[in-house]
């Protein structure tokens, strides 16, 4: 009887732990969906959609834009990028999350406007903080010297 009770308690503990883990990963899925939507909007060059994905008080930190603040300013920066690289595309390689943070590794490809014979390829990693389905912080890292 003691063995049956021990097995029952073990199974109960496992079920409770598994339920808690599943509930915690639901936030990860929602956060990852928000970031996936940002990449889909980027590849469509849809700056209006990008503006809606970022929270109104969002911040973006990157080598070229160390302190962008607000979803409108962030979207305007993407509009400028789409103008400078008309065929810009983000090729997502890795997407992972932990709580409200999403980690993305991707490669930006395209050609600078007027230089169709010179392709660019930039490896990038971004750390996004997502709250209530919106990106509130974007810390992006890349080598500015890569052609």
Describe each PLM feature range:
Residues 52-53, 84:
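Conserved catalytic core of Hanks-type protein kinase domains
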Residues 7-17:
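Bacterial N-terminal signal peptides
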Residues 67-68:
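Acidic-and-aromatic substrate-binding clefts and catalytic sites of carbohydrate-active enzymes
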Residues 1-7:
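Positively charged n-region of N-terminal signal peptides that target proteins for export
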Residues 24-30, 34-36, 40-44, 59-61, ...:
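A beta-strand edge to alpha-helix "cap/lid" segment located at domain peripheries
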